[in-house]
Amino acid sequence: MPKKKTKKKKSNGSVGGKADVHAHEEGKRNKSLLGHNAIFTPEVIDDIHIKAQLGRYRMRGMALMKKIPTFDDLVFLPGTLTRFVIEGYREKCETKTVIGPRCENPIELDIPVYITGMSFGALSYEAKTALARGATMAGSATCSGEGGMIPDERRYSEKWYYQCIQSRYGFNPHHAQLADGIEVFIGQGQKVGMGGHLMGQKVTDQVAEMRSLPSGIDQRSPARHPDWLGPDDLALKVEELRQLTKNKVPIQLKLGASKVYDDVRMAAKCDPDSIYLDGMEGSTGAGPHIAAANTGIPGIAAIREARRAIDDVGKTGKVTLIYAGGIRDGADMAKALALGADAIAIGTGSMIALNCNKDIPEANFEKEMGVKAGDCYHCHTGRCPVGVATQDPKLRARLN
């Protein structure tokens, strides 16, 4: 029997056949020409995946993770004929700095830089006491940070600030009377308008006892102080702290950089002895990544506004301006001072000096933290491989 002729099926342009082959080849050939997705980058996609699994925002520590204007964008114009330079090897450059010159006992620093407030809890006992010893050797000061005082930090610190925070965790009026200065924490640069965070992994029995909290639970400080609703109340709080310390030591207000001119102007009218301004480059022991990346303003813009605000209310020479945030070395400090700051506070830089993010023999960053030394931002986890930001006794032993 003759064979039946079968009609060949025409290829559908959208399914199968040569169209698929061409599409596949086109995809391979044009991959490099089309480029990468500028909005949903691999990092963004990975971030969404992680948040979908967590069911909440991501927490992290350390400094800002996006590019903003920094002190690297500024350069100095050295003196030539217009201004003679100092002969550093035989002429003295005065570095003594006075915070709160109107006080009976102002804080006098040999250098215009001190260690900012980082709590016992966020940092280990070894880190806190090492910073206290180092600051004293340099003729500088330290600050308790939130959560109260550890006696050895006070003992090793020749000059020491005691921090008053929104939650009052660990606050003790008797300890405040031992301080050389009081710092009222209103905000910080990396999470302006938010309270403090300390993850439960770091809330050991000792930390919990100091803060009157159950151990092992996350500690979240409120965003607002319960003692005031506005500048008038804040002025009363400043006066209350003066009475507590018998009008002898400086009272300092710490602000995160936001509406800098207005905020600093209002703060200065409350008549503190110093105002501490924290730029968005400032680090944190724990905070929401989304807030850190999207709030605040850079220090190089903030300092000038703060200086102008203090001058405009007639407080020049009366209210000391302290800047912190993204300070890495002497050049950054000098630029901040040139912009109008009177003194500098450092945090992350001092932690790095203690081996933060250093590839020490005892630590294996990739195995323990999943990142290389130098890329670690896991301060909030309590598993710091170098013993700086942990309460684990085995890890603390790595910080000698």
Regions found by a protein language model. Give the residues of each.
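Hydrophobic faces of well-ordered beta-strands that scaffold small-molecule active sites
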Residues: 113-116, 140-144, 158-164, 180-184, ...
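Active-site-proximal loop/turn and secondary-structure-junction residues that shape catalytic pockets
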Residues: 119, 148-150, 166-168, 186-190, ...
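Mobile "lid/hinge" segments at catalytic clefts and subdomain interfaces of large enzymes
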Residues: 178, 183-185, 189-213, 377-400
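Glycine-rich phosphate/ribose-binding loops and adjacent secondary-structure elements
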Residues: 225-396
